[in-house]
């Protein structure tokens, strides 16, 4: 089971100067996946419980297959294209994604990836040079799996390290749709 939180961050709505499109049910969503734990454990964590009170938790959400990467691929395109591994893939640019739908409607989007070493990083993984810990992995970054994002610099620039979240919040630049991925240590294990 994939455990995740979706937050309707209406409190942030008034502080963003990024392009804004009024939503029917909510104006902003932040999706945070905690894939390697049971829902009850994640919901019982005091920090996550506090965060869940700020928005909504989707409790009937399940993986489409195993291992990880096909689920991340499906999260923004609705299909996993028969992927049954976590190896490096590049899904062709003719495949439509949520990014296309959001941009067609003028809705801002972005990803924040914990321990991703730089904006638009496309490598398979990033290990902490001090500890050797495998912190960031591409298989958990849905947008860069698609050539329609990875091959376009303006789109690739919207995939950022999580450290950029605070700066974007401070400068009123948070997008309306956000996908936030914890690193391999913090993903709910």
Which sequence ranges carry the predicted segments?
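N-terminal pro-sequences and low-complexity stem/linker regions of secreted or lumenal proteins
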Residues: 18-189
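Fungal secretory targeting signals
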Residues: 1-18
């Amino acid at each position: 089971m994939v455990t995740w939180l979706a937050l309707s961050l209406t409190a942030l709505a008034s502080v963003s100067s990024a392009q804004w499109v009024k939503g029917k049910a909510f104006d902003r969503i932040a999706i945070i996946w905690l894939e390697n734990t049971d829902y009850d454990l994640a919901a019982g964590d005091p920090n996550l419980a506090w965060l869940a009170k700020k928005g909504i938790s989707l409790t009937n959400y399940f993986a489409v297959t195993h291992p990880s990467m096909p689920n991340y691929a499906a999260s923004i395109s609705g299909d996993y294209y028969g992927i049954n591994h976590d190896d490096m893939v590049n899904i062709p640019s003719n495949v439509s994604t949520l990014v296309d739908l959001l941009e067609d409607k003028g809705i801002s989007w972005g990803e924040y990836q914990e321990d991703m070493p730089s904006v638009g990083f496309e490598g398979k993984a990033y290990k902490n040079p001090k500890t050797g810990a495998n912190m960031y992995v591409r298989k958990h970054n849905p947008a860069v799996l698609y050539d329609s994002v990875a091959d376009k610099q303006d789109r690739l620039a919207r995939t950022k390290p999580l450290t950029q979240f605070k700066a974007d919040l401070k400068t009123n630049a948070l997008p309306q749709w956000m996908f936030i991925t914890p690193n391999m240590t913090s993903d709910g294990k």
